[in-house]
Amino acid sequence: SCMKAAPMKEASIRGQGSLAYPGLRAQGNLETLGGPNDATRGLTSLADTFEHVIEELLDEQQVIQPSKENKDADLYSTRVMLSSQVPLEPPLLFLLEEYKNYLDAANMSMRVRRHSDPARRGELSVCDSTSEWVTAAEKKTAVDMSGATVTVLEKVPVPKGQLKQYFYETKCSLKGYAKEGCRGIDKRYWNSQCRTTQSYVRALTMDNKKRVGWRFIRIDTSC
């Protein structure tokens, strides 16, 4: 996020709900359609249906009240994965969030949005960011919803052994505009800075009394 003020002031973020995934099941195939024309109509229908499903996935949100004390970390997200090895792709929810943010910013019909890739128009982000999978061994500790520091457990026991906890973190890039302020802000009139903001994710942790449990902790999720 880009903080802008003259003089610089703090800004708060409203909490957003966590996303729920309804069950989906695809049926049929293009071979069951009645010819080339029907196949073309079928492809168009599938594309429209896919966009509709994405919007439904993102619109099904639970209302969660954020903590008043943590105004920069009041978003709820699902960027945690249990795996025996480093995940090769970003989490699905992250991709859906990025897609929805783009659709909201575009403010166009679904058909127009599909052909309006910002990369093709030469658009740039206000703040540059980097994203990567981080292990619990690298995080070691985190702050939970009560403000207490807890230990992030590296491994989670499962019936057939143990899996590692991975966190998909996004933070401001140390290169480029992050040091000079937000891109596109007139420096003659405004002071600005790119700042990493946090969200809550659910992870297996241990508190200072050695009690192990699933808690919401803060991780870096945007710039």
Swiss-Prot record:
PANTHER family: BRAIN-DERIVED NEUROTROPHIC FACTOR, NERVE GROWTH FACTOR NGF -RELATED. The keyword Glycoprotein applies. Its main location: secreted. Promotes the survival of neuronal populations that are all located either in the central nervous system or directly connected to it. One of its GO terms (molecular function) is nerve growth factor receptor binding. The gene is BDNF. Belongs to the NGF-beta family. This is Neurotrophic factor BDNF precursor form.
